Amino acid sequence: MLGKKVVVTGVPGVGKTTVINGAMERLATEGVAYKAVNFGTFMFEVAKKENLASDRDEMRKLEKDVQKRLQQAAATGIAAMSGEANIIIDTHSTVKTPTGFLAGLPEWVLRELMPDIVVLVETDPDQILMRRLGDASRARDMEGYRAIAEHQEFNRAVSAAYAMYTGCTIKIVRNENFLLEQGIDDLVSVLR
């Protein structure tokens, strides 16, 4: 039997990786195994080998054709890993580039991955802004409340298009400040 392929997305700073890690820990205690793969890290490893970027945050500033090629390489590699295993693909529905939004899962990526579920991790834009300001480990572009809200809205629209193409379902999981456990519970219920 094929494993479940779940794409978990969210704008930078929403805490999607934190929610994923919490859900995986909880599921492991129940004997439900998932492998988490970060799509951007997979792309970055290819970019680094080709001397295209020295950190993940530089990738969104690469030429669009280069980003597309890196996406394809990541999709092919991740699809080959999935097989019968349950897999979580930690990624972004859209990536904000200097020339506009780039679909994180364009048609050629979706064709390779064919996810069962797309999860959008969201929270209030002001919470995301504060998280970004407190994260010195990343070189993120500074955006205000309105830009973050627009990015989340655009992610919803793009995710609906992903569902139209693949037939997957969409689930929104909230990662509110001080309510991480509730977000983890919601993701666990989808992953079971």
Curated annotation (Swiss-Prot):
Q: What is its EC number?
A: 2.7.4.3
Question: Which top-level enzyme class is recorded in the Swiss-Prot or TrEMBL entry?
Answer: transferase
Per UniProt, subcellular location reads as: Cytoplasm
Please verify whether the record's keywords include ATP-binding: yes
Q: Which reaction does it catalyse?
A: AMP + ATP = 2 ADP
Q: One Pfam match, by short name?
A: AAA_17
Taxonomically, the superkingdom here is Archaea
Which keywords, in A-to-Z order, does the entry hold? ATP-binding, Cytoplasm, Kinase, Nucleotide-binding, Transferase
Predominant subcellular localization, coarse grouping: cytoplasm
User: Which molecular-function annotation in GO is an example for this chain?
Assistant: adenylate kinase activity
Assigned GO CC terms? cytoplasm
**What InterPro entries does its record include?**
Adenylate_kinase_AdkA, P-loop_NTPase
Please give the family membership noted in the entry.
Belongs to the archaeal adenylate kinase family.
The positions annotated for binding ATP are G10, V11, P12, G13, V14, G15, K16, T17, T18
Protein name according to UniProt: Adenylate kinase
